[in-house]
Amino acid sequence: MTEQNRPGTFEQAVLPHLDAAYNLARWLTRNEQDAQDVVQESCLRAFRFFAGFRGGSARAWLMQIVRTTCYTWLHANRPLQKAAEFDENLLPDSRTPGPEEVVLQNDNGAVLRKALEMLPPNLREVLILRELEEMSYREIAEITGMPAGTVMSSLSRARGRLRQVLTGLTNLDTMSHPQRIGTVST
């Protein structure tokens, strides 16, 4: 590849995947501005090393760079958090939520986003790549550096954890908002 056609080729390979890159960065950093910074840094790295790209899936190649950049950024900018396999203390407290919170909690999308953010990063990552970005096991394996079998077992664990978290969130919502079955008249 000549220097002259490098920018055009790079744009053709990378630009179609920027939304997926941002989505992954957003879920890993949990912050829109940080995700934008990570994607920008990832694109700079991708451009710098584009000459080394040997073909194949440009999407998987870019997502691998985004993933690595995210973890590097998180390590440098956030205190190291040791994630327990599943920490019950991460579930929201059982206080009665205000009216605005009730509306958000009843919205399935908001509950799902909250549940996804409660997963450990390694499980959240494979779930986002598979379910939201619709990547194959092979692509996820390429991005994460895991064998395909490990990707499948991680996805199974992630789905199980997500189910537990969603059940916990749903139970908390119904406990704090019990339905009236009937009234007792005197």
Model-derived regions, located:
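Acidic, proline/glycine-rich intrinsically disordered inter-domain spacer in sigma factors
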Residues: 8, 89-117
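A short pre-motif secondary-structure segment
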Residues: 126-130
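Arg/Lys-rich amphipathic alpha helix in sigma70-family domain 2
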Residues: 64-86, 97, 105, 168
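DNA-recognition helix of helix-turn-helix
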Residues: 138, 144-168
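Σ70-family region 2.3-2.4 aromatic/basic alpha-helix that recognizes the −10 promoter
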Residues: 18, 26, 43-47, 56-79, ...
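A short, charge-rich alpha-helical start-of-domain segment used by transcription regulators
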Residues: 1-23, 33-36, 47
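C-terminal flanking helix
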Residues: 18, 22, 43, 120, ...
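The alpha-helix within a helix-turn-helix
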Residues: 39, 141
